[in-house]
Amino acid sequence: MTEMTLSANAITEIEKELEKYPADRKESAVMAALRIVQDEFRWVSKEIMQEIADLLEMPAIHVYEVATFYSMYEHKDVGQHKICVCTNISCQLCGSKKVLDHLKEKTGVGPGETTPDGRITIKEVECLGACGGAPMMQVGREYYENLTTESIDRILEGLD
């Protein structure tokens, strides 16, 4: 595995985020910094958390606490396309298990697994706040609601 380090582009983006906050409140940009890094690498390593801490002039443990509190931050490499299936009560009652079963049938992997080619990771997640459109899933930053096997097939076919 190659060593992860903040790229010049990531540092520039984080510095832009820092401009939104008072100079003595750099830690306010921690979530944005984690998002920027995850957008680049698809996950956030402990080494990168240390680099973020150094850049934001805050203890590394505070970056780690934020990164591990929120489920949106990955702590190991995930596939090029991360598919998050809501399995909270509304989605569960409306068929999230059928969604997961169909995804496994189509991709060959279940929750917490990544396809051998590194293309797709499937995750079970708690409520994504789209209960009215249950069952639903998130692919990247896009929400897909009122899922059927047919709509799931179209979504999978549309992934590059």
Where are these regions (language model features)?
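Signature of N-terminal electron-transfer/Fe-S-associated modules in redox systems
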Residues: 1-160
